[in-house]
């Protein structure tokens, strides 16, 4: 309804419309760029939105705010890992669980070196200044695993001069506790930010406990007005238990996971040219008890263990050669390591295992890319780029991309984009377990997209419409007990988003996505919509949001199952003074019965309250 009113009033508003500052993004481009000049579709979720609902993890907020993005969950808190985990992202029907959607931290890849997927419990709100989600392939800049899109976490830094600290505590349903503390220091050219968190929950089913603690730190030093050196580190440890499905309960299915990420680099910015060189490492240590059937099984005599690391070097430089131009060249190197093995529960010794159940491998990727963007007559922007990526086992891959932005109105843009994405086979697919196959080739995908975005009412209301078509082949599937490149994927759909800043007290936002899949996949809905409202009045703040999901596939095969549900969430806070704020929130306030994964029902209404103190 709001979208119809905005379009109907468009002609009346054009003459008196004035553009406000647009979001400046770094995802889809290696330099800070006005989003109006990018042919890619990027959704920006700022820290004010990420923290409004008092969530310790960014993923639930992204599911609400980003059209086409779906997230699986299993309880009040925690996702876990392995085949029984949740926390998987589905973007336009493309799955992060298969390593086809990448998570970045400040542009550095984050995924498991053995299985190729991101780890949902690693992405804590405490580290994020904002999150930029690029819907569609981003392999030109980020290579393998950015086939379906990327979620780039832009980390916080100390902004205010002097010392500052905060403490946020909360507790609620099912023994859930969350806590976070942080400290910032800015003194001259030096900036330091450090934060830590602890959370735990029994969750709503017996045997589904979750506990997590971790920290994030970032230091920066401005050598001069043009050069800056930085270092950051993030580490988290969590333990999670899996109770099985309702019809097939399990015991002792426990996980102990440690994940970390470190980066160090130096960056330059001269206005007409900017760039960065950095080294990074994303690593993990996993210990998993696969558990046993609660009715007929016996305890496991061994534990699965793994160590993995994704180490890399990234360099890029972007320059304006002449008016309206921007060329970016870059080089990437990655060393991908994985070691999977089993140990005895009784003695701890490493076990010899048959059928490729254990293995230790290392692979390398090296890539170079160039991207060129040119503004023409203030009405057009053209962009084209190409990447060559070579994997030590899977071989080389060319990745082209091209797009155009047309601005027929001073407050509106028409975007057309064609981009290729790819994913190299993982260590598991090539070396682990009987279906493994070292002859696998990369998965490949083309995305074709048309988008329109406009701002009206002096920028208070903006909306966007996207139409896309995805054509993927060489998808890795297990056929006759062997992994082979045989699958195809053809998805098409539409997305709509709208934000309306009514006045200083009220604002609303809504987004909707429709997806048509030739081959349905688990956790991908045919429709997802969100409508949210924010109120700020005096010392009171309130956020209310409702999410509608239709035809969500919870299982596929001969007898597929789907879910329809409506989720109502709300958060209210009150400032006792400038330094102290009380908050309370409720989730699934309609007490819906629903599930993301077949046999794993979600909790009904849950509540939590807490306090935030600034020092």
Model-identified regions with their sequence ranges:
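Flexible loop and strand-edge segments within Gram-negative outer membrane beta-barrel domains
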Residues: 201-208, 212, 226-310
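Membrane-embedded beta-barrel scaffold of Gram-negative outer-membrane proteins
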Residues: 190, 276-290, 336, 407, ...
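Extracytoplasmic beta-strand/coil segments of soluble accessory domains associated
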Residues: 60-108
């Amino acid at each position: 309804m709001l979208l119809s009113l905005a379009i109907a009033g468009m002609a009346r508003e054009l003459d008196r419309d004035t553009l406000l500052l647009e979001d400046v993004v770094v995802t889809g481009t290696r330099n800070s760029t006005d989003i109006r000049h990018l042919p890619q579709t990027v959704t920006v979720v700022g820290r004010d939105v990420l923290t409004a609902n008092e969530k310790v993890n960014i993923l639930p907020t992204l599911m609400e705010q980003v059209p086409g993005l779906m997230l699986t969950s299993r309880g009040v808190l925690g996702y876990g890992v392995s085949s029984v985990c949740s926390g998987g992202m589905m973007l336009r029907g493309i799955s992060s669980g298969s390593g086809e959607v990448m998570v970045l931290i400040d542009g550095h890849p984050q995924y498991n070196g053995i299985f190729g997927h991101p780890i949902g419990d690693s992405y804590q709100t405490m580290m994020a200044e904002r999150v930029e989600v690029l819907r569609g392939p981003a392999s030109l800049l980020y290579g393998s695993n950015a086939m379906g899109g990327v979620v780039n976490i832009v980390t916080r830094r100390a902004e205010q001069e002097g010392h500052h600290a905060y403490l946020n505590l909360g507790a609620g349903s099912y023994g859930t506790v969350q806590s976070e503390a942080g400290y910032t220091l800015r003194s001259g050219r030096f900036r330091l930010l450090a934060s830590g968190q602890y959370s735990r929950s029994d969750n709503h089913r017996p045997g589904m406990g979750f506990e997590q603690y971790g920290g994030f730190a970032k230091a920066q030093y401005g050598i001069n007005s043009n050069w800056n050196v930085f270092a950051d580190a993030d580490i988290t440890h969590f333990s999670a238990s899996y109770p099985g499905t309702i019809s097939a309960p399990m015991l002792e299915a426990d996980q102990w996971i440690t994940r970390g990420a470190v980066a160090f680099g130096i960056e330059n910015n001269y206005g007409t040219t900017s760039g960065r060189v950095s080294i990074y490492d994303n690593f993990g240590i996993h210990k998993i008890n696969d558990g046993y059937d609660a009715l007929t099984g016996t305890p496991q005599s061994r534990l699965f263990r793994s160590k993995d690391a994704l180490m890399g070097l990234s360099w890029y430089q972007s320059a304006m050669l002449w008016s309206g131009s921007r060329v970016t060249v870059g080089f990437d190197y990655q060393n991908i390591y994985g070691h999977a093995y089993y140990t005895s529960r009784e003695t701890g010794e490493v076990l010899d295992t048959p059928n490729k159940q254990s293995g230790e491998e290392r692979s390398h990727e090296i890539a170079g890319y160039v991207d060129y963007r040119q503004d023409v007559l203030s009405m057009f922007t053209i962009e084209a780029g190409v990447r060559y990526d070579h994997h030590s086992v899977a071989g080389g891959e060319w990745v082209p991309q091209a797009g155009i932005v047309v601005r027929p109105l001073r407050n509106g843009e028409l975007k057309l984009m064609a981009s290729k994405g790819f994913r190299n086979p993982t260590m598991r697919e090539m070396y682990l377990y009987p279906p493994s196959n070292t002859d696998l080739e990369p998965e490949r995908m083309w995305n074709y997209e048309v988008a329109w975005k406009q701002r009206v009412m002096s920028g208070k209301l903006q909306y966007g419409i996207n139409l896309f078509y995805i054509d993927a082949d060489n998808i890795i599937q297990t056929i006759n007990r062997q992994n082979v490149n045989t699958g195809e994927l053809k998805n098409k759909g539409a997305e709509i988003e709208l934000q309306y800043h009514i006045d200083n007290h009220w604002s609303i936002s809504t987004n909707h996505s429709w997806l048509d899949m030739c081959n349905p996949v688990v956790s991908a809905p045919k429709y997802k919509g969100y409508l949210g409202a924010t109120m700020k009045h005096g010392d009171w703040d309130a956020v209310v949001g409702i999410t509608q999901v239709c035809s969500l596939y919870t299982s596929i095969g001969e007898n597929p199952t789907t879910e329809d549900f409506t989720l109502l969430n709300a958060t209210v806070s009150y400032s006792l003074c400038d330094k102290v704020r009380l908050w309370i929130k409720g989730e699934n306030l309609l007490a819906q019965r629903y599930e993301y994964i077949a046999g794993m029902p979600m909790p009904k209404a849950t509540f939590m309250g807490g306090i935030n103190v600034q020092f």
